[in-house]
Amino acid sequence: MKTTILILLILGLGINAKSLEERKSEEEKVFQFLGKIIHHVGNFVHGFSHVFGDDQQDNGKFYGHYAEDNGKHWYDTGDQ
């Protein structure tokens, strides 16, 4: 009787361990999928901010990339 219970217990633990491994691989796939979604959303937000953000105008003025703004700053330096 004890031997039978011991064998059933060992077999049961083996089945649980196998299902745990299968579940773990499914969870990893879900996390990888969510990671890809988060990555793409981050890229979209980053691109959106570059297209519609104010940095497109202000960076050129601050660093003097525009021909009419060379040597000037968009803020008042007080020494002009």
From Swiss-Prot:
Report any one BP term from Gene Ontology. defense response to bacterium
Sites where Phenylalanine amide occurs are at F52
Transmembrane residues, as ranges?
Answer: none
Query: Which positions does the propeptide occupy?
Result: 20-29, 54-80
Q: List the disulfide bonds.
A: none
Q: Does the keyword Mitochondrion apply?
A: no
Q: Where in the cell is the protein located?
A: Secreted
The record's principal subcellular location, in a coarse class, is secreted
Q: What is this protein called?
A: Clavanin-A
The taxonomy runs: Eukaryota, Metazoa, Chordata, Tunicata, Ascidiacea
